[in-house]
Amino acid sequence: MATLKKPDLSDPKLRAKLAKGMGHNYYGEPAWPNDLLYVFPVVIMGTFACIVALSVLDPAMVGEPADPFATPLEILPEWYLYPVFQILRSVPNKLLGVLLMASVPLGLILVPFIENVNKFQNPFRRPVATTIFLFGTLVTIWLGIGATFPLDKTLTLGLF
């Protein structure tokens, strides 16, 4: 806030510029052509130049070539499917695993009905929804990390 300087509207030069439609966006400078024609292409080309420079200077390694005759011990899904994979892998009954996965959206649907007397939007004033969100986030992270461990170390994350 200390770096912002308010314009001096008593300055006749500034008032003349504003009367002609010149000045800062805050004072009604039109987006066309000022931003859309001049500023946006510069930002887009600068971003493109950064991406090209990074790809030329530090190319990503593709990895080792695939060997169709040697499969890994355990094939893992993509990282965003780790929690679901962990539920299916650790629960002995697969139907129970599918029901556990279906209970997540059903539980999220029930949260507004559990806390229907609280009309606040501030998360600190909605303790039930905040607690459920934080608990679900921690369980999801725990399941996601546990999916990368062998099955015997998956619940303790290899710590104990």
Swiss-Prot record:
GO molecular function, one term: ubiquinol-cytochrome-c reductase activity
GO BP, sorted A to Z: photosynthetic electron transport chain
The protein's role, per its UniProt record: Component of the cytochrome b6-f complex, which mediates electron transfer between photosystem II (PSII) and photosystem I (PSI), cyclic electron flow around PSI, and state transitions.
Side Cytoplasmic, residues: 1-35, 116-130
Keywords (A to Z) from UniProt: Electron transport, Membrane, Photosynthesis, Thylakoid, Transmembrane, Transmembrane helix, Transport
InterPro entries: Cyt_b/b6_C (IPR005798), Cyt_b/b6_C_sf (IPR036150), Cyt_b6/f_cplx_suIV (IPR005870), Cytochrome_b_C_euk/bac (IPR048260)
Gene3D superfamilies attached to this UniProt entry: plastocyanin oxidoreductase, Single helix bin
Localization per record: Cellular thylakoid membrane
CDD domains referenced in this protein's UniProt entry, alphabetically: cytochrome_b_C (cd00290)
Quaternary context: The 4 large subunits of the cytochrome b6-f complex are cytochrome b6, subunit IV (17 kDa polypeptide, PetD), cytochrome f and the Rieske protein, while the 4 small subunits are PetG, PetL, PetM and PetN. The complex functions as a dimer.
Primary localisation category: membrane
GO CC terms: plasma membrane-derived thylakoid membrane
Matching Pfam families: Cytochrom_B_C
Domain of life: Bacteria
Keyword Transmembrane tagged: yes
Protein name (record): Cytochrome b6-f complex subunit 4
Family, per entry: Belongs to the cytochrome b family. PetD subfamily.
Topological domain spans for side Lumenal, thylakoid: 57-94, 152-160
